[in-house]
């Protein structure tokens, strides 16, 4: 958290943000719905070092989408659920077309940069996947819906229905190479 605080102070107090903040803020649909997350374990974060960042000036022509699925819990996400995800759910998701890129849990530390408020007191597990477009995502959703065996066990852990966010990468996002 100290590194996060330093980085945010340097960025938001720096000349680049000051010069471009109005334009940047106008592109953000919702910047108030923020969860503070950390990788579920050391190897569950994004592996961006394998991605190549597109060159400046590249167009945002990809039809691919990234999907963030948020699972809500009554209590902090425990090792039992993470084991279930890794042993049962992750392979099943991959088999029906949703390779898991990364997965995270709630960071329970206090928000050390109050200028950027975060939602507190929530317990979540968030996993990310990529699809070649909306049709590929719909194919996955149809295929996964047929796995009633997993749905029952998954739902036994959850506080409520998952929240699904469909995202588009910016033209120079490192996620484009995934």
Annotate each predicted stretch with a short phrase.
Residues 41-115, 120-134, 171-178:
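Surface-exposed interaction/gating patches
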Residues 1-38, 92-101, 117-125, 130-168:
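An amphipathic, aromatic/His-enriched active-site/gating alpha helix that lines ligand/cofactor pockets
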């Amino acid at each position: 958290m100290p590194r996060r605080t330093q980085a945010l102070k340097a960025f938001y107090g720096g000349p680049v943000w000051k010069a471009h903040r109005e334009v940047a803020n106008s592109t953000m649909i919702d910047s108030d719905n923020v969860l503070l997350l950390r990788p579920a374990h050391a190897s569950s974060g994004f592996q961006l070092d394998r991605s190549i960042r597109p060159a400046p000036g590249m167009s945002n022509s990809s039809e691919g989408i990234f999907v963030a699925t948020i699972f809500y819990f009554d209590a902090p996400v425990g090792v039992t659920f993470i084991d279930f995800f890794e042993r049962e759910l992750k392979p099943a998701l991959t088999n029906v077309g949703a390779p898991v890129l990364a997965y995270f849990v709630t960071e329970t530390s206090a928000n050390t940069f109050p200028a950027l408020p975060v939602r507190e007191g929530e317990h979540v597990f968030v996993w990310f996947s990529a699809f070649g477009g909306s049709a590929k995502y719909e194919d996955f959703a149809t295929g996964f819906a047929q796995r009633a065996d997993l749905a029952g066990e998954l739902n036994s852990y959850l506080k409520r229905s998952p929240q699904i966010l469909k995202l588009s990468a910016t033209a120079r996002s490192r996620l484009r190479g995934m």
